[in-house]
Each structure stands twice: as C-alpha cells, then as structure tokens.
C-alpha cells in the first residue's frame, strides 16, 4: 500500500467526516467502494475496499490523497 500501512489505512473508517462512494470502474466482479478520510496520524488517505460480510471489510489498496483529491474532499464535506 503506497506509503500507507494496512493498520493506518484501517483507521480511516473511524473518521466521522470520511466520504464513501462506489468504484464503478473497478466493480466488475465485486462491489468495490472507496473511502477518503483522515487516518489517526492525520494523513488524508484514499482506501479501496469491499464489504465481505456485515462488519467485515477487505482492503484492496490505500494511498495518500493527491492535492487535487484533497481539494475535492474539502469541497464535498
């Protein structure tokens, strides 16, 4: 995961201001979603994930947000 550890990526789900949206471009075989929010270390992180069962999530990838993604996130909140 590009500069973001698995443990750090999983903390984004605790961000009450995080934004979740569908990832239609990568959802051919499974319903992938993307969350953008702050990790507990304060980084703005983008995580691609799939909900497997209730309360079970599989992380696919995670990375720090680009400057454009950061601006988009700030305007969506």
Region spans (language model):
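Ribonuclease/tRNase effector modules and their secretory precursors
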Residues: 1-77
């Amino acid at each position: 995961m590009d500069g973001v550890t698995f443990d750090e990526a999983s903390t984004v789900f605790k961000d009450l201001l995080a934004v979740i949206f569908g990832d239609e471009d990568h959802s051919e075989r499974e319903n992938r979603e993307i969350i953008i929010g702050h990790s507990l270390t304060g980084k703005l992180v983008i995580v691609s994930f799939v909900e497997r069962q209730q309360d079970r999530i599989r992380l696919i990838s995670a990375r720090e947000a680009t400057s454009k993604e950061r601006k988009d996130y700030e305007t969506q909140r």
